Swiss-Prot record:
Biological function: Component of the intraflagellar transport complex B (IFT-B) involved in flagellar assembly.
GO biological process: cilium assembly; intraciliary transport involved in cilium assembly
UniProt protein name: Intraflagellar transport protein 80
PANTHER family recorded: OUTER SEGMENT 5
Subcellular compartments: Cell projection, Cilium, Flagellum; Cytoplasm, Cytoskeleton, Flagellum axoneme; Cytoplasm, Cytoskeleton, Flagellum basal body
Alphabetized UniProt keyword annotations: Cell projection, Cilium, Cilium biogenesis/degradation, Cytoplasm, Cytoskeleton, Flagellum
Annotated region (Disordered), positions in chain: 495-514
Highest taxon listed in the record's lineage: Eukaryota
Record field: compositional bias (Polar residues): 501-514
Length: 1079
């Protein structure tokens, strides 16, 4: 966590009940003068503006709620599913500032709970971001008493907690000090409610938090309960503190955990799935927790505030990232006060002392402890309400790495990208504080992404193919470093400007070109019209940052590239090869072009828990809505491919890969047309490293076509059907996979079926998978699993070597979608085991203020149950055809995040499975066969067998089955290889795949299917085929009797059902038998 800027201000006094109603706009109540105040915090965090917006209210406000920005009622907020339309009527929109003080306005409904038991509904107009005057204007308000709902007109029921349920706020949860919880639903009008739920909890209700549109957590006394308002308010989770002297006073949640703020014990992190404690973060000595808040973005962190002004930043699994204090780590800045007409105001509160009006003289005074704290709606930045003023802070996202390239936030708005291959580090200035960092998980091309409050920035580092294309004379050319990413693509942001800041270059005797440092800089939104043309000097937000002078040109330069306009703050971005997906906080998902960020289409996703529930390739976009509903759309049009199937468990991880099936068939057809056997590869060449394996000489490609310098994948045709593989991991750690098609007609009749209609469960050695990920642009599925005795013994280990059961292995399944194929599993296990016990022990010391061994041990046990591990990205290998350099430019590697990204590491991926995949997809089966023969590994032979089945290559299938030791099946393949036309069903039956019989049956070749099954002595399968086609029973009885008689087994029909079948169908002429064989 970077430092904190505090704004000392005794006027207005005692601000509490912080509630955000805009991306830079919050509302708070003063307990001294009983007025409401608006607080404007621009994303730059350079200043804070405060203004009074209401008259004194008769009773003290002790709780307040409003819908977060982007969650209002709109056309795209329908719960019926995604709509192919842009969200044009959001309750709050990011609008560009105009020259006038009044811009487009929206409305907000604020609900306040008072100490006298009344609810105050305030309807307010909210002006756009460009105005310089007061932003919130109260239109009308109405008060109602909760006594009419609770009973007892004379009793007073202080409203201690409120929560407006998302997405449209039609439901309102009210918690009372007397222990009653009310669920009110809007009926027809703004102030007309119907009571749905009334429950007496027998303890004061301290906090209510909306987990999603259906679930809410209620804290009362020392207990917390999670209810589902759509399932008869059933209880899904319950938890109670062990000590009676403590209470849960604050709540926050991420996609997987629920954070409880306890005054004395500290912050308790509960797993939402199991209800178990996974971490406890105690407060400092003689201090107490007053508030907790979570980020609504992909980083999934949360912060804890204490009464004495300590702010603790944590990861999702409860491990401490950083800590700061208001007293020692904050920079003091003045607060700006404005009146309703925009003029500076010196006195806002009716009760303020005139001697306290000049806050600039008290700039060095302390703001005191913290009353309330909340993240901004876009995450990253947070606002604290203190005893004597306000404070803003910033929690930077964690560093990300692809193995060779690293992206990290080095300042409030500066991003550094480091390329370890070229030893290059570039620093870029973002328009606002950087909130989240992303890597392209599914794209073959590595892309880096960053989000701010209102913009998206995408970098595309140069590929190894581009780097290797430079001349090697005189070593690595300097032009490589100079031409490294100079123009990051970005979306429209606050100031809507890009100003190139010219860096002064020294004369070079080597004739190097002058380099222009591209710097993203934006106008301060709150500047008055006309200030844009002046030179300004930015104040440092934090003491640790050096001041930086920004040069403003007299004329604003337009954006260098066309970009989509982000209406609401982005929450997730998913980077692909041709398309990116930008999901904002309202649920609107914009599919944009990868080259320009220009908008392609927009859909609406009502509920999305994590960016691990989205997967995108060029032909399909899959996502999980509401945790259990899987939907697939075409990113090129926004139309449904699959409207929705229901999974029986919540989905944790979703990944998508491009199927090899279509590539192999296309390559096979191309080879057949050209009359060659696997030498039609034109998209890559192999170097001398693999010359002994594949029979290829370095620098002398044997292909007739020209070869390029890198091993890359064949591009997928846009009209390919059956072109992708989908895999998901649910909360029970069960893996489901399926090969799907891009044709919507294939799923038109599914409706709301179960996911098992398109996916099948996959198991491997009874190991528990923690995370799954396809290697980019392939169907090779990588799984991060726990170490077990059934796995091959590891040759090396990362981490400690003895006394640990916290070990992981990475495995690659080369054919994740398979039926009952009787072959060796094509699964490759990395020879390195990962021991993360040291990471767990480091995380277990969650207390940064005390040294209690028993406390640390307890925390370690809790963290051991978390097991939040992630595969961030898997980069496939790249080869170079050059005798002067190493051929393997980039080896296949995976980037893993252990224990909630507490530690990131790079692990090698088995190379030969990737190489065989590329060879097979390119139709280069001769080299693939040489590779298998040289290595002679059963998983590699099994992978080769699956590719031969897809290509209907019976000749090479015979070799693969021989390598697996399946002599009978190889002999059968040899017997049918002499046929002019080898049927795909016969090929599948050769290895015992029941799908082969289905293929032959669908083609009307029942006789051929029965003959193939009998040749493999699979008489039970042949009998199953005949039961649906009884006219072929004589053929089955004839073949079975003949095969047994040839072995001298004349009594083969003495048992049922063959005894009765031979009596009924045994006397048939041979002419009829031959006729049935041809059928």
């Amino acid at each position: 966590m970077y430092g904190i800027s505090s704004f000392y201000c005794r006027d207005p006094p005692n601000l509490t009940c912080l509630t955000w109603i805009g991306i830079d706009l919050a509302v708070a109540a003063s307990q001294t003068d009983r007025c409401l105040y608006e607080i404007i915090v621009p994303p730059s965090l350079g200043q804070v503006r405060v203004s009074r917006i209401s008259d004194p209210i008769p009773s003290t406000i002790i709780s307040m709620t409003a819908l977060p920005p982007g969650n209002g009622s709109s056309a795209s907020s329908s719960t019926s599913g995604p709509a192919v339309m842009a969200n044009t009527a959001s309750s709050y929109q990011i609008t560009k500032g105009s020259g006038s003080s009044s811009t487009s306005a929206s409305q907000a409904t604020i609900v306040a709970g008072c100490a006298n038991g009344t609810l105050i509904f305030i309807q307010a107009d909210v002006l756009g971001l460009g105005c310089t005057s007061q932003r919130v204007s109260v239109r009308r308000q109405k008060s109602i008493s909760v006594s009419s709902y609770v009973g007892g007109e004379d009793a007073i029921h202080p409203v201690t907690s409120l929560c407006m349920m998302q997405p449209r706020g039609s439901s309102l949860l009210v918690g009372l000090e007397t222990g009653t919880v009310l669920l009110l639903t809007m009926m027809g009008g703004l102030y007309q409610f119907r009571q749905i739920l009334k429950s007496n909890l027998n303890a004061p209700v301290h906090a209510i938090n909306s987990i999603d549109r259906n679930r809410a957590a209620i804290a009362y006394g020392g207990s917390v309960t999670v209810i589902n308002i759509t399932k008869n308010n059933s209880t899904e989770l319950s938890y109670k503190l062990q000590s009676d002297g403590d209470a849960i006073t604050a709540l926050a949640n991420t996609g997987r955990v629920l954070v409880l703020g306890c005054e004395h014990r500290g912050a308790i992190v509960l797993d939402l799935l199991s209800g178990l404690e996974i971490s406890v973060i105690p407060p400092p000595p003689y201090d107490a927790v007053v508030s907790v808040s979570s980020q609504p973005v992909a980083s999934n962190g949360f912060i804890i505030a204490t009464r004495r002004g300590v702010v603790i930043g944590c990861r999702e699994n409860g491990t401490v990232r950083s800590c700061a204090t208001l007293e020692y780590d904050s920079a003091h800045l003045p607060v700006s006060k404005i009146a309703a007409d925009g003029a500076p105001a010196t006195l806002l509160s009716p009760l303020a002392d005139s001697s306290m009006t000049n806050v600039d003289e008290n700039l060095g005074s302390s703001v005191g402890g913290i009353r309330d704290l909340a993240f901004a709606p876009y995450g990253g930045s947070f606002l604290c309400l203190c005893l004597n003023g306000l404070a803003v802070g910033y929690l930077a996202p964690q560093r990300l790495s692809s193995g060779y390239i690293t992206i990290e936030v080095t300042g409030l708005t500066t991003v550094m990208i480091t390329d370890a291959r070229l030893q290059v580090s570039e620093v870029y200035t973002a328009p606002e504080p950087v909130i989240s960092l992303f890597l392209s998980r599914f794209a073959h091309t590595l892309r880096l992404g960053a989000t701010t409050a209102s913009s998206v920035i995408v970098w595309t580092p140069p590929t190894m193919a581009k780097i290797s294309s430079f001349s090697l004379e005189g070593g690595m050319p300097l032009v490589t470093k100079i031409q490294w990413i100079t123009e990051p693509v970005r979306s429209t942001s606050y100031g809507d400007m890009i100003r190139p800041s010219t860096v002064q270059n020294q004369p070079s005797t080597q004739g190097l070109p002058n380099r222009q440092q591209q710097e993203l800089d934006f106008d301060n939104l709150l500047e008055k019209p006309g200030d844009t043309l002046q030179q300004t000097e930015s104040r440092p937000l934090l003491k640790s940052f050096s001041q930086k002078k920004l040069e403003h040109d007299k004329a604003s330069n337009p954006p260098i590239k066309t970009a989509a306009y982000v209406r609401n703050p982005p929450r997730y971005i998913v980077l692909g090869d041709s398309y990116h997906l930008v999901v904002d906080i309202s649920g609107e998902a914009n599919i944009v072009s990868a080259t320009t960020l220009a908008l392609v289409t927009s859909i609406y996703i009502s509920s999305l828990d994590s960016d691990r529930q989205i997967a995108i390739i060029d032909s399909a976009l899959a996502y999980v809505e509401g945790g259990t509903t899987l939907r697939i759309i075409d990113p090129r049009s926004g139309n449904f491919i699959l409207r929705g199937v229901i999974h029986h468990k919540a989905v944790l991880d979703l990944t998508i890969g491009i199927s090899s099936q279509q590539h192999i068939r296309n390559a096979s057809e191309t080879s057949a047309k050209e009359g060659t056997q696997g030498n039609a590869v034109s998209d890559f060449a192999l170097g001398s490293v693999f010359s002994n394996l594949t029979g290829h000489q370095a620098g002398k490609p044997v292909d007739a076509t020209a070869s390029t310098s890198s091993l890359k994948q064949t591009e997928m045709s846009s009209n390919d059907a059956s072109s992708y593989v989908l895999a998901l991991l649910d909360t029970s750690n069960s893996l489901y996979v399926g090969r799907l098609t891009t044709s919507p007609q294939a799923y038109a009749k599914l409706g709301n079926s179960m996911s098992t209609a398109i996916l099948q469960q996959s198991k491997f050695l009874d190991s528990i998978p923690y995370s799954i990920q396809f290697i980019a642009q392939t169907d090779l599925l990588c799984m991060l699993i726990s170490e077990s005795q059934s796995l091959p013994q590891a040759l090396s280990q990362i981490g400690e070597t003895v006394g640990s059961d916290c070990k992981l292995r990475l495995v690659v399944d080369a054919c994740p979608v398979r039926t009952s194929i009787i072959t060796e599993d094509p699964v490759f296990v990395t020879p390195t085991t990962i021991d993360y016990s040291s990471v767990q022990r480091s995380n277990a010391a969650v207390s940064i203020f005390e040294e209690d061994p028993s406390r640390i041990l307890a925390a370690y046990r809790m963290l051991s149950r978390s097991n939040i591990h992630t595969i961030h990205r898997i980069t496939p290998m790249v080869l170079k055809n050059d005798g002067l350099m190493s051929n393997a430019i980039t080896m296949s590697h995976a980037v893993l995040g252990l224990a909630g990204d507490s530690s990131q590491m790079v692990v090698a991926v088995p190379e030969f499975s990737v190489l065989l995949n590329y060879l097979a997809k390119s139709g280069n089966t001769q080299r693939a066969l040489r590779l298998c023969r040289f290595l002679d590994q059963k998983p590699l032979w099994a992978q080769m067998a699956t590719y031969c089945i897809e290509a209907n290559n019976i000749q090479h299938l015979q070799s693969a089955l021989s390598g697996l030791g399946m002599v009978a099946k190889a002999s059968y393949c040899h017997s049918i290889s002499s046929h002019n036309e080898v049927n795909a069903g016969a090929v599948k039956l050769a290895i015992g795949d029941p799908e082969g019989a289905n293929i032959l049956s669908s083609q009307g070749k029942i006789g051929a299917a029965i003959l193939a099954a009998c040749d493999l002595w699979n008489f039970s399968k042949a009998l199953e085929l005949c039961r649906g086609n009884k006219k072929y029973m004589p053929l089955l009885v004839y073949l079975r009797t003949k095969y047994h008689n040839n072995l001298g087994m004349s009594n083969c029909n003495n048992e049922e059902p063959w005894l009765s079948l031979s009596r009924q169908y045994g006397n048939v002429s041979e002419d009829e038998i031959h006729r049935l064989m041809k059928g």
